[in-house]
Amino acid sequence: MRTSQYLLATQKETPADAVVISHQLMLRAGMIRKLASGLYTWLPMGLRVMRKVEAVVREEMNAAGALEVLMPSIQPAELWQESGRWEQYGPELLRLKDRHQRDFCVGPTHEEVITDLARNELSSYKQLPLNLYQIQTKFRDEIRPRFGLMRGREFIMKDAYSFHADQASLQETYDRMHQAYSNVFTRLGLDFRPVQADTGSIGGSYSHEFHVLAESGEDDVIFSDSSDYAANIEKAEAIPRETVRPAPTEELRLVDTPNAKTIAQLVENHGLPIEKTVKTLIVRGAEEGKLIALIVRGDHELNEIKATKLEQVADPLVMATEAELRDAIGAGAGSLGPLNLPLEIIIDRSVALMSDFGIGANIDDKHYFGVNWERDLPVPQVADLRNVVEGDPSPDGQGTLVIKRGIEVGHIFQLGTKYSEALKCQVLGENGKPVVLSMGCYGIGVSRVVAAAIEQSYDDKGIIWNDALAPFQIALVPLRYETDVVREATDKLYAELTAAGYEVLLDDRDKKTSPGIKFADMELIGIPHRIVVSDRGLAEGNLEYKHRTEQDAQALPLNEVLTFLQARVRR
């Protein structure tokens, strides 16, 4: 491809509304253009990258035994009402009416549509398992679209759905898709982690997220430094570093603390180490009118997902109001503790191993110091209540936990029978009786992968693509292309490279465009291999080669170009 025949839409300045680096660089490199809030047009340069992602995804889905379909993006309300999600989904679901005043939505996901297809097409266990996928435009009406393609309203997604007669079959396909996802992100050259995850609003019983590691990521990714253990922050099990509770060394004492409404103030004003403090959080219980006390160490954070999985706690988690605290305990939020507390108490594992610690006295402006379990109060129910912190022991017993930021690019679920039961999707089983199908759901954010790859690999000059993702593999930049000797050598080399199967962008802009601008544009776009053709180099029988990640260029004999590139360019 020649730049004279291409839409080369690079920009020197960074748009003011672009915050994250992927958004900035995709605009500046001429990959996308904003149409409206959360809506983007893909220009040729960006579309080439996304098509490469799609190609790898298709190959791995096909290899895993999935069959490609294409479902409508507009979905009838009746299906969503049948599943119960028409009202549950909330304002992110873009609802509309046709000219006959019938209700539809723009699909944010396709569980209902695929389940409707399956219940109409499948009748026997002999047709199972069945795994169907599509690459389709989705729409979620985000309240505040931001970060370009990282959190837009319209996006491209690969979603697959599998149907099974039993759990064993679902597990087999789930494992195969897990491997297929790992294959996809490995082939795309990304540094990623598959992590155990909570199933969230999609539902189901078991799931994994796939995260590209990047400092700009919105999620915490937890993994062991010595094993394959990995989980997201909601799912990661918190194991105490301590194994034994120390013996008491202090006497219990009641202390006036008028200036200690928070843990930070308690530490600062009374010299108590933060790891010797606790937070007593009062939440509403699952039983109407009941309050539950959840206690974590002062330097730890309550994990709301873990808390709501306790049978005593209401879901979603709701903190007690100040009025409720006064009515039930007689003290405000800054002075609460487990001693003489007239509520059911659940403490975190780390709290159960504390000694000589400080707690609120359930009297305004007073705390107990030197508190010890079993001596001063009984050990209540113990549970995993907190977020893990870096350095915690790995739950599998191997190594310690590391925390990195990650961008979620894939998510796989074992849905079970949630949708098949709601939509009555069943077949005749081997015994001739109806069997409600078990389902799996598997998503990859195709357009998000492009942005995530940039967040992981860039410098002050622009994007750094690897060979698998680059819009072009080679940038061919002639100096003084208007001269016969340079033009003839460049055109000959361009023909040889394209005939050999390389994707080449020939920068044939005229002499009004300086070499510096050409080099800067190719680096901004992120093309991994650059070859410069100059009359001086040709006189010596050489070209100039430079990799995008290298500082210095090197002389490359003209007659060794193809051999050299064969060893350097991943194809």
From Swiss-Prot:
One of its GO terms (molecular function) is ATP binding. GO terms for biological process: prolyl-tRNA aminoacylation. GO terms for cellular component: cytosol. It comes from the Bacteria. Its EC number is 6.1.1.15. Keywords: Aminoacyl-tRNA synthetase, ATP-binding, Cytoplasm, Ligase, Nucleotide-binding, Protein biosynthesis. It catalyses: tRNA(Pro) + L-proline + ATP = L-prolyl-tRNA(Pro) + AMP + diphosphate. Its main location: cytoplasm. CDD domains: ProRS-INS (cd04334), ProRS_anticodon_short (cd00861), ProRS_core_prok (cd00779). InterPro entries: aa-tRNA-synt_IIb, aa-tRNA-synth_II, aa-tRNA-synth_II/BPL/LPL, Anticodon-bd, Anticodon-bd_dom_sf, Pro-tRNA-ligase_IIa, Pro-tRNA-synth_IIa_bac-type, Pro-tRNA-Synthase_IIa_type1. It is found in: Cytoplasm. Consists of three domains: the N-terminal catalytic domain, the editing domain and the C-terminal anticodon-binding domain. Homodimer. NCBIfam families: PRK09194.1 (NF006625), proS_fam_II (TIGR00409). Belongs to the class-II aminoacyl-tRNA synthetase family. ProS type 1 subfamily. Catalyzes the attachment of proline to tRNA(Pro) in a two-step reaction: proline is first activated by ATP to form Pro-AMP and then transferred to the acceptor end of tRNA(Pro). As ProRS can inadvertently accommodate and process non-cognate amino acids such as alanine and cysteine, to avoid such errors it has two additional distinct editing activities against alanine. One activity is designated as 'pretransfer' editing and involves the tRNA(Pro)-independent hydrolysis of activated Ala-AMP. HAMAP family: Pro_tRNA_synth_type1. This is Proline--tRNA ligase. It comes from Pseudomonas putida (strain ATCC 47054 / DSM 6125 / CFBP 8728 / NCIMB 11950 / KT2440). The gene is proS.
